[in-house]
Amino acid sequence: MSGIAFVEVRTRAGQEDRSAPWRPVVRNGENHATFYDTRMGNFDANPFPPQTCQTCAASLTGKYGNERCHGHFGFVGMPRIRPGSAHSDSDRLVVLNPHLAMDADRLFRAKCFFCHKFRAPTFDVERFRQALVLADHGLPGDALHLLDTVPTAKGHDAMLNHRRMANEEIVNDVSILQSYVDRILRQRASGCSEEDAKARVTMAQKGTVDVRNDICNMAISHLRSFSGPCSHCTAISPTFLKRGGIIFFLFRKSNLVTNIAKGFLTQQEVSEWEAVNRLHGRTGTYFDGRQMLFHMKNLFAKEQAILGLLYPNLGEPSVFTKTNKVVPASERYKLFFLDRILVPPLPLRLSSGVRVNDNGLIIPDEQTRALSDILGFVEQIECFHTLSANSTNGRSFITDAQRAVNESNLRNLQQKVDEFYAEIVNSFAKKEGLFRMNMMGKRVNQACRSVISPDPFVEPNEVLLPRPLARALSFPEQVTCFAPARMNLLKHCVVNGPRKYPGATHIELRHANGEIRSVDLNVPEQTRRQHAARFFAMAQSGVTLIVYRHILNGDRVIFNRQPTLHKPSMMGYRVKVLSGSKTIRFHYVNGNSFNADFDGDEMNVHVPQSIETRAEVETLMDANINYLVPTSGRPIRGLIQDHVAAGVLVTLRDKFFDHSTFVQLVYNGVGPYIQENVGITLAELIPIPAILMPRPMWTGKQLISVMVRFSSGLSAASDCGREIEGGITLKGTSQIQPSAFDRIPAGSCDAVRAKSGAVVDSTVMFANSELITGFMCKKQLGASNMSAPHHVYELYGPHRTGQLFAAFGRVLLLALRKEGLSLAMDDMFLVDEERRCDLLRKLDDIALDVPDEEATAAPMIADYATKIQQEFVPQRMLVPFPKNHLLLMTISGAKGSNLNATQMSLQLGQQLFDGLRVKRMNSSKTLPSFFTNEKRARSFGFAMGSFASGIRPAEYTIHAMAGRDGLIDTAVKTSRSGHLQRCLIKGLESLVVHWDRTVRDSNGSVIQFMYGGDGLDPCKASTLTAWEMMKDNVVDVSKRFGGDASESVAGAEDGAAAGLKEMRNEDGKPTTEAVQNAHMEQQLSTYPLPASLDKSLSEYLCKKADFPLFRKVSTLARWDAKQQLKERLQQRRQKWVGAFEKTLADITARRRLWALCEPGEPVGLLAAQAAGEPSTQMTLNTFHTAGSTVSHVTEGIPRLRELLIYASVNKAAVVVPVTNATEEDEKVIAKMLRAGVAAKLTDCLAKVTDGAGGQSASSSMQRNLNTGFGKGYHYHVARGRTGMVITVSFLFSRSCLEELRKRMCMSPSEHRQSFTEALKNVVRLIMRSLSAVPREKESGDGSGNTGGMKGGSGRADRKRKRSGPDDGGGPLGGTFGDEIMRIEEGTDSDDGMSERSSIGGGRAGSEVSSLHSDGTDTRGIAGSDTGGPQRRRGSVESGRGDDASDSEAADPDLYARRSGSPARDAEDGGEMQDRDGTDWGGTSMQGVVGYDNFPEIHMSFTKSNFGAVIAPLSTAAAARDGVVQLHEDFFIVNAVLRTASDVIAVIPDVVDNALEAQRMPSWLPQFGSLTFTRLKDKGSGQLVFQGPGSTMRNVMSFLSLFTVGIKSIKLHQACSTDIRDMGTYFGIESGYAALYDELNKLFNRYNVDPRHLSLIADTSTHRGRWENFNFTGVISTSASPLFQMTFASSKRWLHRAVSRGMSDDLESFSSAIMVGERPRVGTASVRLSTDTAILRDVLERNFA
């Protein structure tokens, strides 16, 4: 710091001279610098005169100093201990460095307070040191293995992670450990040179940064957690406390006594600490800076070895200069403290907003104000030390109050320093911070922005720029004497100046000595002429002259629309400047690339500022070149709307043009290109007319053919009588099918079919660029795969495709102007309106007879609506197609869809909200205009009206609601998808294809050994297997890509293929071509054609390809007469197959080499864009698709966030395929379906809903609402002064329990134990909700302990003891890792009571009538208050006026009696022998399990006033308490809960939640739901496991018990939607495959190339675990701290980089952009060289 800051500021803000604040303030004969001292930079603030930097003036030549001075640092010194002494500057107090405060606190907690070593044993310290040594040598695996296998001194790690391999030596001594590591290092270093070893270590260290950081964190955590006496000196260290950044230490009294006894402390020291603490009113002792410095110095001196590895680069300067030096390891402790605070340079602080008030006082900025506050505390502390220095033994100027104030000042000084540094760090963080706002998003000068407009007459790769924008932008062009014309143009621009077009803004002169001079041309014209004459003469004498001219026609610019979601959103264009234009104009064909709709959108234009960049824009970024989108490898550019409609109108079979119109259309289309093709005239392009008499007429198909033939490089040679070779040949389908021409007359139900011509035109066929049949609809003119423009792109290149689009656009627009296209009301009317109304009435009533369920009614309504739509649109339209322009637009794909036509003419249809119909309100209505519980389709949002007929107010309301819901969904989805794409961009930005075809990240780690598995570029490989295109166009494909031969069809007598002719010239070749051919042959041998492609080609040629097997029908007749027809046809086909197979294989091999992804390609960015751009189209919310195999599965953006952002799945599902199941297998599956679903305790309750004792339904309803009766339980509350007693009586059904027992495959005793454990868990959950008790303390007696149980209960009990009641599943459910959560699905049992049974009759019924309104009777089912009226919520009763509450809550005996203890009723026939639970009675006399005779269970909790008793109520006890006529299937279990008197809760909600969450423990793994979804094939389907416990381990364990010998259940094909579960159970490769499959399912409909998805999946799993694309996953593993700081949590990454002294080699994109470095990608990943020796060496090595 002393090397960059030499101006000490000693004057607080506000104390400077108001007239000259930069002048030093004189105090005691010393000059004290102010915060505005000019030695820290230029001072320029109104109303003061500007002052130059004195530091620059002293070091630079000239009296004016440096006008561009950025300033110099000053500093604020910490308090001097002896202010008046000569060495006061070197003896200062220190404060803790805020950046390293956290690390210092950890070290203080880990060290011994007395011997200043780590308290942990030496072996533990050496263990971590050797692990770091291995990591630094590039051996992270060995380092982690060392920590796993070598235990600590106490053997903790060995017990938890016992992974020692067989015959591995035991390391338990420091010397053995050191020799063990040395041996590993020697083994790894053997066999390689020293240079290779260093290179290997350097490369490995970059990829192991995260492992090293993990080891450092583990080491510090372990050393800090070591408790007890020091292992070296046996002293006991204090406890450190940190409050507000201040550290205190505190000794326990017992520890003080021990340390004093051992001599580590004296009583005097302790007394001094206690006196100071009493003075400040605290218990801890302040740990001041001098004490911290002393302790840290000794720690670094004694633990230098381990600390040097924990902080390896700490103290190293980021940039080495002459004044910088490396801090030795023994002095690195000084970096944890600060003795001075840097003051930012003066210009930086002045630019932050310095203001001057009316009194002339400078109002400082935030940083200056904070530094001034620090300086104020420094002055106060120095005053204290001055008084202390002047004090003597006989006379002291220091009082206790002053000492207290001084300590307070010291603490405040530390806090102010922390706040100052925190403000600096916060300026980096978040979106508005310096990293993301300023350093990542750079402002560019040569750019403009304006509104865009479409222009069909401009070229597709041209942009029309308004002249004002062209004058505002400039391009630097160097003047060269070898181009006189260009030199004269630049001289003319200089003379015109910046205001006249074409002109120039300024010129730049670069001399040979490196001097650069800039001359502004905003001067008078005469001066500009002089500049032009003088400087252009200098250009001829060796001076480099650069003219910054205006943008001219032909310049290249980058056109961009935000948001830039993918690569085509930023493309290169050729400029054409227009004087009258006010907006930026470009062709329609580019709208889809930018997602621009010309409704006021604005776009950006960037002008490249170098010749190299301009060349890259022209050759790599040109709009024509970006015809295919990297997301899918399919076309993204295409004509839209009016052009498509015109294409259909032009290509109708009855469309003809006369000569003048046809020639005019042809000239408009290809006129701009005729001059470029020498030798082709307009007359040669006109074909023979289709109709000769009575006058020549040409068809629209001929017009299209002329455009395609011209783009294919062919002329109209069809009249020359010779056969045409070349031109595109394709066979595709049209979007207009023959059904569009069908009509259904009024009053009829039979459709009148289309004519044969319409059927023929439904197939688009080109032969040698001649359109034979078909309509030019969206499939041919739009952005469609394998369309005519796509064929032109693949065969003739991108620029021919651009010409074709431009010609199509001009021709079709001019033709449409002649034809016209408008929409009339007749186009929306139907023929048979009465039938429409009748069918819609039937649709409205169709849901009346079906259950009111979404899954039943909605599909039925949708199917019927679809049938109506198919009948009416387009068959029953008043104006038929193609005269109906509404149908013309929707069917051809020009605008809208069939749904829009249906809504305009027929009906609006069903309105959906998140995929569901509108729901009913609390009034059981969907809208006030409908009836209660109405089930008609209209009431659920089906709009019967159309836009032509009008809609009703209710339909309008629901339609508006659905539109609003969609807008909200879009708004939320935009932010979610934007964050998703940003995370993907950051996580994948550094993935680049390297020279060896591998994909590596910035760390050098290999992500993929071959990009995408095959190394092919998605755009280049999109048509690699388009065999039909290659076969039909083999001549042109061979011309473009080369090959040994291509097909040549000659007219042989038998019509067979005449053979193959050579396409290459075998004469003398130039050297360049020879080298290229040699390189191609070498590459073909290195990368041969894969067998899969060869097999695919053979299958196509043998099974799918069509060949002309004959030319004359007479030939067939002759073969048939000789009975050789089949044989001859097969022979001819085999000849064609043989002729094509070798040729196409050779071409495909060459095309595959050409399609390999180029080194330097940023495939990571392309993959992130491919996944991020379609995510904007995904639905946001979770939805359930009808018929889906896995229901309730998160889809869309939430699912993507689970997979990529969080790497955690909320609702996992395991799918197991089933194929060809037999009847026996079906029985096993049915058994599994019953046994696999988790049984809930609420399924066993007898839910009584009828009134008892002849009571009315109303009274029964009141009872249900008040007491929970009807839910299967009853509760009662008794409140007293000392506590509250809650009695919950559960009514269970024996038959339901027995059915569950059979379903769960358990013995009677096991199931009874499961039942009691479930009861205990329910009580735990209730008590936890009431008292917030985290876990049960202990059981009151032996009866509450259920003991062991078959099926692994001991293991379950151990897990329960370890996990507590949070496991939810009890001691058995916890075995399978289940957690307490709401179960989604379950099986509800019947009520379990016959109609003749009743509860509470007789005595209970008579007592109900005598109850008072204040609830004086408090007995429940166990007593006689069956219908006792309580408050509305039934949760808490008042203790006042209740004669039973106080005594009941206070009397423990009464509390025990309320539980209905069986011990009290043993004489009533119970089979219980005692309370110890030694004999549970087995089963009852009826052979059913005795669920009602278990011993009472006592439970106590951590709070003494909380407890519970669970006991069954015997039949005799129930009868004695008033419960009569209890059905023999039912029994009652009482749970009496004792809580504090101040507990307030809604008892029904608490009990309901506990019952719903509790499952019956089972020895079998259990799941939330288990379904079998059948497929179309008989006996085939899928087993789907969902809910808690749906893991692969549980599913496999469950299936292994049922599938022995069953082959139909494919266990090896089981798959889980939880990627981590798959990776843990099967291995990380299985996790990768599962993640890839999940991504493929999500992006399948968006045609995302599999290579992108595989790269994303590989990036997420390549480190052996499933990592997210967030700061806790992929981002955290990067070795670039600058890259991490630009993502999120800047403070965290900055602290780690500073504390660990991490460096950044700028390999990542973000780090390179931050510092202005060119990212090493694309053309920047290679270096161009003109050295002929290098070229000769390459040629000799590869082609000699």
Curated annotation (Swiss-Prot):
One of its GO terms (biological process) is DNA-templated transcription. Residues 953-965 are annotated as: Bridging helix. It holds the Pfam family RNA_pol_Rpb1_2. GO terms for cellular component: mitochondrion; plastid; RNA polymerase I complex. Zn(2+) binds at residues 56, 69, 72. PANTHER family: DNA-DIRECTED RNA POLYMERASE, DNA-DIRECTED RNA POLYMERASE I SUBUNIT RPA1. DNA-dependent RNA polymerase catalyzes the transcription of DNA into RNA using the four ribonucleoside triphosphates as substrates. Largest and catalytic core component of RNA polymerase I which synthesizes ribosomal RNA precursors. Forms the polymerase active center together with the second largest subunit. A single stranded DNA template strand of the promoter is positioned within the central active site cleft of Pol I. This is DNA-directed RNA polymerase I subunit RPA1. It comes from Trypanosoma brucei brucei. The gene is TRP11.
